[in-house]
Amino acid sequence: MAKKSMIARDVKRKKTVERYAAKRAALMAAFNAAEDPMDRLEIHRKIQALPRNSARIRVRNRCWATGKPRGVYRDFGLCRNQLRERAHKGELPGVVKSSW
């Protein structure tokens, strides 16, 4: 199990990303559309003025059951250990052991 403080930090980052998503997307679109270097510089400064944690890249993909940050399968949101346990118990619909 991951530290509760790390999980809480990640939850806080997700909320910050949500809050600033529209503003960041608008600034990025303007930045990519601007051709004048001075305009691009000004828009870049506005992007840099946003909180660091408002960037999507800062959010860590974590297992929703244990909070582990590594070995997380995107399709399920579970770490590899939990995925294996739950698949064996039959708790994941459509997941079967492979055999050939």
Curated annotation (Swiss-Prot):
Keywords noted in UniProt: Ribonucleoprotein, Ribosomal protein, RNA-binding, rRNA-binding
Which InterPro entries has this protein been placed in? Ribosomal_uS14 (IPR001209), Ribosomal_uS14_bac/plastid (IPR023036), Ribosomal_uS14_CS (IPR018271)
* GO terms, biological process: translation
The residues forming the signal peptide are none
> Which PROSITE patterns does UniProt cross-reference here?
RIBOSOMAL_S14
- One GO term describing the cellular component: small ribosomal subunit
Q: Which Gene3D superfamilies match?
A: 1.10.287.1480
User: Taxonomically, which superkingdom?
Assistant: Bacteria
Question: GO molecular function terms here?
Answer: rRNA binding; structural constituent of ribosome
Per UniProt, subunit arrangement is: Part of the 30S ribosomal subunit. Contacts proteins S3 and S10.
NCBIfam families (UniProt xref): PRK08881.1
**Family membership:** Belongs to the universal ribosomal protein uS14 family.
Quote the function comment for this protein: Binds 16S rRNA, required for the assembly of 30S particles and may also be responsible for determining the conformation of the 16S rRNA at the A site.
Tell me what this protein is called: Small ribosomal subunit protein uS14
Organism this protein belongs to = Synechococcus sp. (strain CC9605)
Which gene holds the coding sequence for this protein?
rpsN
